Amino acid sequence: MRTDMLRELERIVRLAGDMVREAHDIEQVTTEKTGAADLVTKYDVAVQGFLKRELLTLLPEADFFGEEGEHAALTRPWTFIVDPIDGTTNFVRRLHYSNISVALAHDGQVAYAVVYDPFADQLFSAQKDCGAFCNGLPIHVSDKDMAHAVFLCGSTIYDRSLTEQNFSLLRQLYDRGLDSRRF
């Protein structure tokens, strides 16, 4: 069952998705944060600013922790955790594999989460102890046997010290599953 808080988070994140979908001049406004693989655009900053305003209007007593340099002290019971454009490298190259990620944690535990792909109009949301949803419909973990499963994985591009561990885990999944995909 989705509560009013989850519905409000979904609404706000969809509005942020409109900003991402309507972006232009992306290539001309890109800068590096910590290296060539860690990019930020004016849209990352604008979407994060929008989300901060809207989310703190929704829950003013919360802290805000944003990927683009907005790291609160995290001393309050409620904290918003935001990645305004998760997949900026794809976004800059106009590959439509980016999303907006927002979580609301209470006392260090995620209570609500919303991940929205504005290009596919897929909104995933979850509420602690209430299940997960895709575009409002309940979803669940697959019950397929691992031998018949296809795995999707990411990597640790920002911390190369974890590369060996990452690929070791991927190898274990690959050996036990049907196939793997990396996006």
What is each of the regions a protein language model found here?
Residues M1-I85:
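N-terminal subdomain of lithium-sensitive/metallo-dependent phosphomonoesterases centered on the IMPase/IPPase/PAP
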Residues V141-F183:
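An extended, acidic
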Residues A111, I139-V141:
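Short, isolated positions in well-ordered beta-strands
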Residues L74-F133:
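DPxDG-like acidic metal-binding loop motif
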